Amino acid sequence: MKRLLSTLLIGIMLLTFAPSAFAKQDGKRTSELAHEAKSAVLIERDTGKVLYNKNSNERLAPASMTKIMTMLLIMEALDKGKIKMSDKVRTSEHAASMGGSQIFLEPGEEMTVKEMLKGIAIASGNDASVAMAEFISGSEEEFVKKMNKKAKELGLKNTSFKNPTGLTEEGHYSSAYDMAIMAKELLKYESITKFTGTYEDYLRENTDKKFWLVNTNRLIKFYPGVDGVKTGYTGEAKYCLTASAKKGNMRAIAVVFGASTPKERNAQVTKMLDFAFSQYETHPLYKRNQTVAKVKVKKGKQKFIELTTSEPISILTKKGEDMNDVKKEIKMKDNISAPIQKGQELGTLVLKKDGEVLAESPVAAKEDMKKAGFITFLKRTMGDWTKFK
């Protein structure tokens, strides 16, 4: 059982949250947002609130939107220091043999992680995706295991990966909702939009094989605020897109599966984004990695450890509603004791209004904490004993 560490009234002016505002859709207007797609979903990034959905849990071929998970695992490896942007990645014969969209890597060719990430995010390179999979995990098969493990960690119930590219393969599927959650997780790493939000760039500059990259997501150029995330197309999947756009404090993620043409795909995503920004607004409360509390640690080298947010935390409301305040609660896990690793989840931050939960998000250790040595532990025990003497 979890115990309540603290309850703090946040004296901030926020718009009133009404659960029915998100459960009820605005009739005819929302029914026409993605009427040509097989499935679609619209969420707000910080809160994950679903603003619109159409068959969003249907299992369908995701095509190259698969690379959202591929990029997520790359960004995680970078964040944990397992790889660096400057690392050289050598292309295997297997990676170079990938068909479909590619950056035409040759066996033995080397590019940096940064260059490979450009090739994946901008040009949807299948060869670059497999090269990075092999670089991180040793083989494509081991990387796919990581992809499915991460999907399970994120609670995705309608996703199964067979490759890191999205090329058609039996048993390879996802859903609009699951894809939106993957994009939500990827966008925690804000630097990813430097890649996904770039419309054109070059690889192999200053060589006779200079290669022009043009983003397959045309909305980056034509819809203000769009900076990601990934398109997809195969004969089975048809035209797909997971798009992200930011306006003011609000970031929306719109996903479309199975549109008949690129024009139709972009039009439906545009309608969803327009709807999100015209009807809702986001109120940021915490940035990612912001310190929110500290907790006592048993047997630690230090007595207390600071807790930080694991993602941006905001409240989403309909526009024009009344203002009110919000309560913050931090529910800690029982028996927190050293050793503790940086980033280890130690509790949950809960935001409530009038008893209704508005948002929940994990809080994690700000830094590593080793177990106290014998001398430290003895001094602390003696100090505690003298206090009660």
Curated annotation (Swiss-Prot):
One GO cellular component term: extracellular region
Pathway: Cell wall biogenesis; peptidoglycan biosynthesis
EC number: 3.4.16.4
Region forming the signal peptide: 1-23
Class of this enzyme: hydrolase
Protein localization: Secreted
Catalytic activity, reaction form: Preferential cleavage: (Ac)2-L-Lys-D-Ala-|-D-Ala. Also transpeptidation of peptidyl-alanyl moieties that are N-acyl substituents of D-alanine
Keyword Signal included in the entry's annotation: yes
GO MF term set: serine-type D-Ala-D-Ala carboxypeptidase activity
Keywords: Carboxypeptidase, Cell shape, Cell wall biogenesis/degradation, Hydrolase, Peptidoglycan synthesis, Protease, Secreted, Signal
Domain of life: Bacteria
A GO BP annotation: cell wall organization
Family under the similarity heading: Belongs to the peptidase S11 family.
Its job: Removes C-terminal D-alanyl residues from sugar-peptide cell wall precursors.
Protein name: D-alanyl-D-alanine carboxypeptidase DacF
Organism: Bacillus subtilis (strain 168)
